[in-house]
Swiss-Prot record:
Glycans are attached at N66, N99. APOD occurs in the macromolecular complex with lecithin-transport and binding of bilin. Appears to be able to transport a variety of ligands in a number of different contexts. Most heavily expressed in adrenal gland, lung, brain, testis and spleen. Disulfide bonds join C29-C135, C62-C186. Residues 1-21 form the signal peptide. One of its GO terms (biological process) is glucose metabolic process. It is found in: Secreted. The modification Pyrrolidone carboxylic acid is found at Q22. It comes from Oryctolagus cuniculus. This is Apolipoprotein D. GO terms for cellular component: cytosolic ribosome; dendrite; extracellular space; neuronal cell body; perinuclear region of cytoplasm. InterPro entries: ApoD_vertbrte, ApolipopD, Calycin, Lipocalin_ApoD, Lipocalin_CS, Lipocln_cytosolic_FA-bd_dom. Its main location: secreted. SUPFAM superfamilies: Lipocalins.
Length: 189
């Protein structure tokens, strides 16, 4: 057992260095309840990122996502951000509803060779806000959280943000590292 742990330590140290700034925790992923009676058709359209737990692949501001239905029944995901140099960075992926008994548990994939990542809609009223959670368990010992608070507009009232953060804390999801996404003076993409 000890030699196995010694082999894992460098790998774990590498994971921790890659995950700096991200929400990296001991133990397996929490399993919070998702939005009941989720209707993906009402969810489609443009969402603006209001707050998030920082992720290595989002470096800009004015971050937004646009969801549209594809002919094959999957959901096209187009994420866009404004880079510090003024250029627009975008990435396109697909989301699928793999569990029809829990339609708010989607999976999203941006690259063919990458695994599908969880995309769980914990709460939404479809017209104003959405709370999205993603978590990956790493070798049964650690997990990495991703959280996004989204709005149909670039601004959400503070009481709505507090309500959504309360959902997270009630489900043992750490919100300490959440940051506000700059949505001021943003161009239309």
């Amino acid at each position: 057992m000890a030699p196995t742990l010694l082999l894992l330590l460098p790998a774990l140290a590498g994971l921790i260095s890659v995950a700096q700034g991200q929400a990296f925790h001991l133990g397996r992923c929490p399993t919070p309840p998702v939005q009941e009676n989720f209707d993906v058709h009402k969810y489609l359209g443009r969402w603006y990122e209001i707050e998030k737990i920082p992720v290595s692949f989002e470096k800009g501001n004015c971050i937004q996502a646009n969801y549209s239905l594809m002919e094959n029944g999957n959901i096209k995901v187009l994420n866009q951000e404004l880079r510090p140099d003024g250029t627009v960075n975008q990435i396109e992926g697909q989301a699928t509803q793999s569990n029809l008994t829990e339609p708010a548990k989607l999976g999203v994939k941006f690259f063919q060779l990458m695994p599908t990542a969880p995309y769980w809609v914990l709460a939404t009223d479809y017209e104003n806000y959405a709370l999205v959670y993603s978590c990956t368990t790493i070798i049964w010992l650690f997990h990495m959280d991703h959280v996004w608070i989204l709005g149909r507009n670039r601004y959400l009232p503070p009481e709505t943000v507090t309500y959504l953060k309360d959902i997270l804390t009630a489900n043992n999801i750490d919100i300490e590292k959440m940051t506000v996404t700059d949505q001021v003076n943003c161009p239309e993409f």
